[in-house]
C-alpha cells in the first residue's frame, strides 16, 4: 500500500507521518518546503493546488492534513474541492483530517457544533469553512473519501496513549465527560482506518478514552 500525506510537516501531518513510518508503511510526504521535514522520507515538493491526478493516482491512499493559514480560512473549502476534483473517478482513497465543527449535537441531526458558534468567535472562520468543505465533499460523486473529525479539543501536545474511541458523526465525550483527543492518538486512529478501510464515504469522529 502506497500512502501520501499532504502537509506532512504540519501539526497533525507530522504526527500522522511519524505513525505511518513507525508502522513501516510505504509513505511519501507532499510538502511545499521539504527542508521542514525532520525525518528521512520520500517527498514530492509541490503546492497542494498544483497537484494533478497524475501526481496522486500512484497512491492507494492520500491523506489530506492541510491546514489553512490565518486570514485565508476559505482555503479549507477550495483545497478540499481541488483534491476531490482530481481524485474523482480514480481508485485512490482520500482521507481528510477534518474538524469538530461539523459534528452533530442533537439526535435529529439538525444542529452541528458550528451552528452554535458565535460568528465573532476567533475560530469561527476555520470552523465554518471546514464544515462547509464537508458539505460539498458529501455531494461529490465517484470519490472514495473518509472524513475524520477530532473531538472538540484537538490537543497538539498530548502524549500518545495508544487508546481512542472511533465513533459516528456526533460529538462524543470520553469517560471523564470531556470531548478531547490527543493528536498523536488521532494519528493512530487515522492510520488504522487507512489499513482497515471500513468507513468509505462516511464521516466519523475520534475521541479519547
Per-region residue spans from a language model:
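Conserved beta-strand positions in the Rossmann-like core of class I SAM-dependent methyltransferases
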Residues: 4, 28, 146
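Short, polar loop motifs at secondary-structure junctions
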Residues: 29-36, 152
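NAD(P)H-binding glycine-rich loop region in Rossmannoid oxidoreductase-like domains
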Residues: 35-90
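Residues in the short beta-alpha loop(s) of Rossmann-like NAD(P)-binding domains
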Residues: 9, 33, 100
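N-terminal Rossmann NAD(P)H-binding glycine-rich loop of SDR-like oxidoreductase domains
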Residues: 3-23
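C-terminal substrate-binding/catalytic lobe of Rossmann-fold NAD(P)-dependent oxidoreductases
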Residues: 131, 139-209
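Short, hydrophobic beta-strand segments that form beta-sheet elements in well-ordered domains
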Residues: 24-32, 43
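Glycine-/Pro-rich loop/turn segments that contact NAD(P) or position catalytic residues
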Residues: 75-159
Amino acid at each position: 500500500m502506497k500512502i501520501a500525506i499532504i502537509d506532512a510537516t504540519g501539526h497533525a501531518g507530522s504526527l500522522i507521518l511519524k505513525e505511518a513510518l513507525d508502522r513501516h508503511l510505504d509513505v511519501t510526504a507532499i510538502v511545499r518546503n521539504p527542508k521542514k521535514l525532520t525525518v528521512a522520507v520520500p517527498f514530492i515538493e509541490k503546492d497542494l493546488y498544483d497537484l494533478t491526478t497524475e501526481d496522486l493516482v500512484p497512491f492507494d491512499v492520500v491523506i489530506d492534513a492541510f491546514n489553512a493559514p490565518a486570514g485565508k480560512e476559505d482555503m479549507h473549502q477550495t483545497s478540499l474541492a481541488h483534491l476531490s476534483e482530481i481524485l474523482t473517478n480514480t481508485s485512490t482513497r482520500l482521507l481528510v483530517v477534518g474538524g469538530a465543527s461539523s459534528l452533530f449535537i442533537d439526535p435529529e441531526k439538525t444542529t452541528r457544533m458550528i451552528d452554535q458558534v458565535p460568528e465573532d468567535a476567533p475560530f469561527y472562520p476555520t470552523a465554518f469553512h471546514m464544515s462547509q468543505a464537508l458539505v460539498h465533499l458529501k455531494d461529490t460523486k465517484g470519490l472514495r473519501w473518509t472524513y475524520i473529525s477530532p473531538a472538540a479539543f484537538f490537543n497538539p501536545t498530548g502524549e500518545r496513549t495508544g487508546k481512542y474511541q472511533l465513533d459516528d458523526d456526533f460529538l462524543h465525550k470520553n469517560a471523564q465527560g470531556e470531548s478531547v483527543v490527543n493528536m498523536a492518538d488521532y494519528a493512530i486512529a487515522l492510520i488504522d482506518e487507512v489499513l482497515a478501510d471500513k468507513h468509505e464515504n462516511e464521516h466519523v469522529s475520534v475521541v479519547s478514552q
